[in-house]
Amino acid sequence: MAKVPDLFEDLKNCYSENEEYSSAIDHLSLNQKSFYDASYGSLHENCTDKFVSLRTSETSKMSTFTFKESRVVVSATSNKGKILKKRRLSFNQPFTEDDLEAIAHDLEETIQPRSAPHSFQNNLRYKLIRIVKQEFIMNDSLNQNIYVDMDRIHLKAASLNDLQLEVKFDMYAYSSGGDDSKYPVTLKVSNTQLFVSAQGEDKPVLLKEIPETPKLITGSETDLIFFWEKINSKNYFTSAAFPELLIATKEQSQVHLARGLPSMIDFQIS
């Protein structure tokens, strides 16, 4: 008489084999971390204020950048995804590694970049090439004349009846060995040693007296350098010290630096 198979015994054996296999897999997973698991274990209090190297056996902080409204948000997160620190940086200004490390010290604040926008320009060396224009006059888009203000250290724009008061300029060309698309120049009041000097946004340009025409301009002296650009009959002078600002005028006001309207930033030269 043939033996009837014991179905319950087969199911029991199958269950036992699967249990052993499952136990082996569980044991393996407990003793081997995934290759992609950058960190594990709890985040210790003593490392919340420090940056540590990114190794698979250590807890680390990750810096993430999100771009929104011309801002950079830098976040430090734990291995559990919790945001520990957050800082905002201006997107259009440079920031350094020190700025990133500073995340660990403040919960949230706006970083004032340690490098001013013109700091890179200050590292350039401008060498005198030659004089390119002599005794020329500048008129703005309202056809106002440029003349020396009563304080003798500023320039002013207005419509003059006596054109003898109108300032004449000399222009000197320089070479920086940098961007060939830019044309660095200095502007000097003719027959004087007064050079036009940039002072900042909406601030009047200063007439700085220099004993002789500078042959080499570096560092803080880059306030004397302007990038001359000519488009058709319009001339523009962008400050090397303040790269987003140009020499500008308003109606009957001192010559200053501005980004554009309501100031006028184009000039006619004759």
Curated annotation (Swiss-Prot):
Phosphoserine: residues carrying this PTM: S90
GO CC, one annotated term: extracellular space
GO BP of this protein: cellular response to heat; cellular response to lipopolysaccharide; connective tissue replacement involved in inflammatory response wound healing; cytokine-mediated signaling pathway; ectopic germ cell programmed cell death; extrinsic apoptotic signaling pathway in absence of ligand; fever generation; heart development
Domain of life: Eukaryota
Location within or outside the cell: Nucleus; Cytoplasm; Secreted
Propiece span(s): 1-114
Chain positions carrying an annotated carbohydrate: N46, N139
tRNA processing in keyword set: no
Main location: nucleus
Keywords for this protein: Acetylation, Cytokine, Cytoplasm, Glycoprotein, Inflammatory response, Mitogen, Nucleus, Phosphoprotein, Pyrogen, Secreted
Entry function: Cytokine constitutively present intracellularly in nearly all resting non-hematopoietic cells that plays an important role in inflammation and bridges the innate and adaptive immune systems. After binding to its receptor IL1R1 together with its accessory protein IL1RAP, forms the high affinity interleukin-1 receptor complex. Signaling involves the recruitment of adapter molecules such as MYD88, IRAK1 or IRAK4. In turn, mediates the activation of NF-kappa-B and the three MAPK pathways p38, p42/p44 and JNK pathways.
Domain notes: The similarity among the IL-1 precursors suggests that the amino ends of these proteins serve some as yet undefined function.
Protein name: Interleukin-1 alpha
Organism: Rattus norvegicus
